[in-house]
């Protein structure tokens, strides 16, 4: 199921000025293959969020066929915004139109605490109000602000909530309203469910921030790096209390260069003994929603 290697991409080692002709690809029903694209390794973004000595070589023209969603993943440290801007300019003017022509949607991850909760607190305070006095109109206005800031301003189609914490009831009360407002605009409950995407990605089974708003999302992307299908089965059973199995999408990772701490070892040899084969087989056999892969440019690489 995961024979989609980077070597099968449209252009090998595309340079910044290349503009390949996009060939359309057929969809795969309700099965998804999402990849996380590490923007700081793009050929247009140099010296941002990394001290690796080797040159960036990948571009979004290199993304293989067979993928239906690209998660644009990037953290830009304070003071490095100018160095990162060429990537976002290229994303809007060239990369996004090219990938759209191939039938691919692009989303961007947002930190749950930073945007769903603390971001709203900061924004509502700037309006001279507080959480207790916030109205539905305030949540709607904040949704418009977030969508413009993180999505439409760079030509993307959706957003992805990255949940890796354990919010309390007060925080969940805020995020439920933030998510509900955003779901009016993007995702399956919006006026444009086909052209937009709203995802929930998590590495745990803490469902308090999910259960009330579960119908707002296209699917759950479950980060289970370093784990086999036993974990897939347990997590799928938890989330299937709220969503259909076809909306549960487990994910693994290729090895990130120079990472001395996170040795997930998902892509090992022999392939038939690897987590990739095991989880892909389980996803197929149990009618899950597909799979996702983090760090697609590290296919076939090692941690060195």
List the model feature ranges, each with a label.
Residues 6-23:
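Sec-dependent signal peptide cleavage junction
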Residues 1-3:
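Sec-dependent N-terminal signal peptides
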Residues 23-276, 285-288, 297, 301-304:
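Chitinase-like catalytic core of GlcNAc-active glycosidases
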């Amino acid at each position: 199921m995961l024979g989609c290697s980077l070597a099968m991409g449209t252009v090998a080692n595309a340079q910044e000025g290349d503009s390949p002709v996009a060939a359309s690809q057929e969809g795969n029903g309700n099965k998804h293959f999402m990849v996380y694209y590490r923007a700081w390794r793009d050929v247009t973004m140099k010296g941002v969020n990394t001290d690796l000595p080797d040159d960036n070589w990948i571009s979004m023209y290199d993304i293989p066929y067979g993928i239906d969603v690209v998660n644009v993943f990037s953290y830009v440290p304070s003071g490095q915004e100018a160095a990162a801007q060429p990537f976002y300019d290229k994303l809007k003017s060239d990369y996004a139109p090219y990938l759209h022509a191939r039938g691919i949607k692009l989303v961007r991850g947002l930190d749950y605490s930073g945007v769903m909760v603390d971001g709203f607190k900061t924004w509502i305070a700037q309006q001279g109000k507080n959480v207790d006095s916030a109205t539905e109109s305030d949540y709607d206005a904040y949704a418009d602000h977030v969508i413009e800031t993180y999505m439409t301003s760079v030509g993307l189609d959706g957003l992805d909530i990255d949940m890796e914490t354990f919010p309390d009831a007060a925080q969940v009360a805020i995020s439920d309203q933030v998510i509900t407002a955003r779901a009016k605009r993007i995702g399956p409950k919006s006026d444009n469910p086909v052209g937009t995407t709203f995802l929930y990605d998590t590495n745990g089974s803490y469902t308090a921030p999910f259960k009330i708003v579960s119908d707002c999302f296209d699917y759950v992307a479950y980060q289970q790096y370093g784990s086999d299908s036993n974990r897939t089965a347990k997590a799928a059973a938890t989330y299937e209390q709220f969503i259909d199995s076809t909306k549960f999408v487990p994910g693994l990772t290729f090895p990130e260069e120079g990472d001395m701490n996170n040795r997930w070892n998902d892509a090992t040899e022999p392939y038939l003994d690897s987590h990739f084969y095991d989880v892909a087989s389980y996803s197929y056999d149990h009618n899950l929603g597909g799979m996702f892969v983090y760090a697609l440019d590290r296919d076939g690489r090692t941690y060195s």
